[in-house]
């Protein structure tokens, strides 16, 4: 099997897809379809239920810039609190045990990764609205 670090961005996403599927299964969302969303830092997948409801699965990077599980949990708890107050923020989706953050490994992936699932927030990218 080719080393993870030698793979293209798409090749790495293919291997990390198993982590996204596991995170969705553990949240009762296993029937979602997945689409890779290119990003410069984390690996992101957009997930959609047959009824159109959307989610984002964020798989953290590996290495010195990676967030620890406790850092990701603090971020997720903060976003959950903001969402519960009525602010339009990406709301983390807990797993069946109530955890907002998961840590998974997979064959062919160099280390365990921190994974968080968020509800899809409709809108346009801010960059589309910025300009001179």
How should each PLM-predicted stretch be described?
Residues 16-20, 40-43, 75:
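Short N-terminal amphipathic alpha-helix/helix-capping patch enriched in small hydrophobics
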Residues 13-17, 47-52:
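Short hydrophobic/aromatic-rich motifs at helix boundaries and adjacent loops
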Residues 1-32:
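Juxta-kinase regulatory segment immediately upstream of eukaryotic protein kinase catalytic domains
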Residues 27-50:
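ATP-binding glycine-rich phosphate-binding loop
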Residues 10-13, 41-45, 106-113:
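Short, functional N-terminal and low-complexity linear motifs
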Residues 48-132:
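ATP-binding pocket architecture of kinase catalytic cores
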């Amino acid at each position: 099997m080719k080393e993870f670090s030698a793979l293209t961005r798409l090749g790495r996403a293919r291997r990390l897809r198993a982590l996204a599927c596991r995170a969705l299964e553990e949240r009762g969302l296993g029937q979602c379809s997945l689409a890779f969303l290119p990003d410069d830092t984390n690996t992101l997948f957009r997930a959609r239920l047959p009824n159109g409801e959307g989610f984002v699965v964020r798989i953290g990077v590996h290495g010195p810039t990676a967030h620890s599980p406790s850092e990701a949990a603090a971020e997720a708890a903060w976003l959950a609190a903001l969402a519960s107050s009525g602010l339009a923020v990406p709301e983390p989706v807990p797993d069946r045990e109530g955890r907002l953050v998961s840590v998974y490994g997979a064959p062919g992936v160099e280390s365990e990764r921190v994974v968080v699932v968020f509800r899809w927030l409709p809108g346009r990218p801010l960059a589309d609205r910025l300009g001179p």
